[in-house]
Amino acid sequence: MNRFLSALTAAARRLLPQVYLTPALRRLLLASAMLAAAITLAGQPAAAQSWDTSHWTASWGAAPAGPPADASPHTFTDQTVRLVVQSSVGGNRVRIRLSNELGSTPLRIGAARIGLRAQGSDVAPGTDRALTFGGRAGVTIPAGAPALSDPVELHLPPLAQVAVSLYLPGAVQAPTLHGQARQTSYVSSTGDHTASASLPVQRTITAWPFLTALEVDGMRGAVVVLGDALTDGARSTSDANRRWTDVLARRLQAERDAGARLGVINRGIAGNRLLADNPANPLAGRSALARFERDVLATSGARQLVLMVGIEDIGNGSAANPVTLDDMVAGYRQLIARARAARIAVIGATLAPFEGAALYSVEKETLRQAVNTWIRSSGEFDAVFDADRVLRDPARPSRLLPAYDSGDHLHPNDRGYQALGEAMPLLDAR
């Protein structure tokens, strides 16, 4: 308070001489300003007078999309959902982010809790914590809005299985979700079972409704990967965390000391495009250009960005609606500029081969090669991740190496994702 009033006095003394005032009136105005400031500060709650100096970093994240064409698997009536995610980095305080971005009505969360998962839907003893929102046990999230929980003390190890439980009173449809979680989560029988160590499971889901981030306090920062199905881990083994970003998270834990370990945040959406939305598939999400602020810049602690998106633009191009190299370069340059403005380093990933896939053509392969040449040689990225070279068949570079092909000639299998995660270049933490 004393420092504030001293500063106010000094400011007033600098300002007031610029206007002709009598000494008495000058003293009166100065005293009035100081009294008003003192009254204002006295009326503020203690919490409002202090700054949160924590350094929050995302440890897990998913990009929301939707709504799904069939909403029935993601409709809840007075039930608890227990969502299972895996941390990348650890900490001793945690918080979560929820989203009702695509909802048309307010979303009521009656209660929320977090803990380490033991197995199945069970929470490990001694780790269950209640989450609050502005000090309250529940929160109503307006249509189109996100919500951030209050921090809670919880020792979260890196690479830990985490259970986030949300009680949804009333009837709720989940228009905001990540549709291809490749992870089993759980839906309870009727009622608030957020505090139950073992959930009374009615059914399971393989999506992450509403939950978009798990954050920890005190880590150095995060690598955000903006991508499509290859980032989302399409056709990898479910419930095994075999996405290439999971491999990268394990590498960072093994190869770096604690001060240089970065969170790894997967913002991939299967079917996602660089330049335009896919109106035929709502679960493919908004284009990378459209979702960049939400999924990259708003990620707590974002320090590095991997751009691994564009093959869906090429594969879905047509004679009536062609995509050109200039279009792709303009899109990449826009994302690079927006990342650099936020002091985020950008790693460009080349596009993987897809000969034999349903969307393949010779013309599209020519464009893919041109895009990859630009990514490798333009010098516009801080580093290049040559995913094409990792995954391609040396004997036929337009197709995936058979040992890495999941069978659809577009998406890798677990071995292919492992190879990607091991080949990803590591930049210095910054």
What residue spans do the PLM features occupy?
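Active-site-proximal beta-strand/loop segments in catalytic clefts of secreted hydrolases
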Residues: S99, Y167, L226-A229, R267-A270, ...
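Bacterial N-terminal signal peptides
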Residues: A31-T40
